[in-house]
UniProtKB/Swiss-Prot annotation:
GO terms for biological process: cell wall mannoprotein biosynthetic process; glycoprotein biosynthetic process; protein N-linked glycosylation; protein N-linked glycosylation via asparagine. It catalyses: Transfers an alpha-D-mannosyl residue from GDP-mannose into lipid-linked oligosaccharide, forming an alpha-(1->6)-D-mannosyl-D-mannose linkage. This is Initiation-specific alpha-1,6-mannosyltransferase. Disulfide bonds: none annotated.
Length: 396
């Protein structure tokens, strides 16, 4: 009898526990349902889209950090700027006049082209060797380095141009290298000519202009930064080269159109139908376009060497190291990586055009004032660099 009573108690407890468990489970599910209903009552398509866009922006920021700090968008800008950068941003290179028309404004303008002390300028131009001996991998930003070359960096005719890059960009490292310094940088970056085909190709080139062309690609490949010919001067600060809408994108190569001769006889005057200029280039170190370009130039140099055709023939410069092969390397990469891509994509270009991590600037950017092919005045807001064409490479 006692055994039956105990059995009944156990069975009753089990049934009660099961009922309690089912009740609790149902209550939890009910709470979830109520939560979902309350969320649906607050739901609007605008709110959902805002949340999604906000999430997208947060994810993009994790991978697309801005290459350049933008003063207007960062309330804590002062916390990140060095004294030199702060000084730079306090002196705008552009402004509007009283009639709201654009006018050129430099901290140091071209009216002061001959007004400088040579000894003082020479002191500022001396660049310690260790400022350009460091390695930066591809996928880095374009570093704050400005590269220029000259047989005599301290010649007054050279300094009257190069100083504008240094004075207007005090937070950048600025190097004007002579032939021996350029050679040393190539060897330190790519190895001695006894073991490096690249360095040996550089050493074998018979014309100074060939070496000058090749060096700009090599230094940008190895170190990155901005290369500009010694007879150029900035019309805008380098930060202004990238439009506001692209400043949070990872831009790793900036090129400008040199020529856009939309006419049947274009090949009588230019190497390519649309041609990119080489007198000013900005790049992150290790960019694939630069690697491919260096490979092509190295292969061509060795091919000419092996066939005993290395000569001082300036007619081959356009195709050997000049704008022809430079343009081909860019166009081939963009077509292969983001294609189809052809000259039709950039003919009569009037605004900066971003393709992947390559920013293509219209002809006015680096070729203002040429008077044709859509090039506008050096006073135009899109004019970034003035090229004075003072070089005489054909006489070398």
């Amino acid at each position: 009898m006692l055994r039956l009573r105990l059995r009944s108690i156990v069975i009753g407890a089990a049934i009660a526990g099961s009922i309690l468990l089912l009740f609790n489970h149902g209550s939890i599910e009910g709470m979830e349902d109520l939560t979902e209903i309350s969320m649906l009552e607050d739901y609007t398509p605008e709110a959902a889209n805002k949340d999604y866009v906000g999430q997208q922006e947060e994810e993009e920021l994790l991978y697309d950090q801005p290459s350049y700090i933008e003063e207007e968008e960062d309330p804590d800008l002062e916390a990140y700027l060095s004294d030199l950068e702060r000084e730079e941003l306090e002196h705008s290179l552009e402004e509007l006049d009283e009639e709201n028309n654009y006018k050129l404004h430099l901290r140091y303008s071209f009216s002061q082209l001959q007004d400088f002390d040579e000894e003082n300028e020479a002191v500022h131009m001396i660049v310690p060797k260790d400022t350009y001996e460091f390695e930066v991998p591809y996928h880095a930003d374009i570093p704050k380095l400005i590269w220029q070359t000259s047989k005599d960096p301290f010649d007054r005719e050279v300094m009257k141009y190069t100083r504008f890059w240094r004075i207007n960009h005090p937070s950048y490292s600025h190097a004007v290298l002579d032939d021996e310094q350029s050679k040393a940088l190539v060897i330190s970056s790519f190895g001695d000519s006894s073991v490096s085909k690249i360095s040996q190709a550089y050493a074998m080139m018979p014309l100074p202009v060939l070496k000058a062309d090749f060096f700009r690609y090599l230094v940008l490949l190895a170190k990155g930064g901005i290369y500009s010919d010694i007879d150029t001067a900035p019309l805008k600060h380098i930060n202004n080269w990238i439009p506001r809408e692209y400043r949070k994108r990872n831009i790793r190569l900036i090129v400008g159109i040199e020529a856009d001769p939309d006419r049947p006889d274009w090949n009588d005057y230019y190497a390519r139908r649309v041609q990119f200029c080489q007198w000013t280039i900005a790049a992150a170190p290790g960019h694939p376009i630069l690697w491919e370009l260096v490979r092509r130039i190295t292969d061509e140099t060795w091919k000419l060497h092996d066939s005993k055709k290395l000569s001082k023939n300036g007619e081959s410069v356009m195709e050997w190291t000049g704008p022809g092969i430079w343009t081909d390397a860019i166009m081939d990469y963009l077509n292969w990586q983001y294609g189809p891509f052809s000259v039709e994509n950039i003919t009569n270009l009037e605004e900066p055009y971003l393709v992947g991590d390559v920013l293509i600037l219209p002809i006015t950017a680096f070729s203002p004032g040429v008077g044709h092919m859509g090039s506008k005045s050096p006073n135009d807001p899109m004019a970034y660099v003035q090229h004075f064409f003072a070089g005489s490479w054909k006489d070398d």
